[in-house]
């Protein structure tokens, strides 16, 4: 799973 911070983009 990707970082939550990355998904914010």
UniProtKB/Swiss-Prot annotation:
Domain of life: Eukaryota
BP GO annotations: neuropeptide signaling pathway
Keywords from the UniProt entry: Amidation, Neuropeptide, Secreted
Modified residues (Phenylalanine amide): 9
Record flagged with keyword Secreted: yes
Family: Belongs to the FARP (FMRFamide related peptide) family.
The name this protein goes by in its record: FMRFamide-like neuropeptide FLP3
């Amino acid at each position: 799973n990707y970082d939550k911070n990355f998904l914010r983009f």
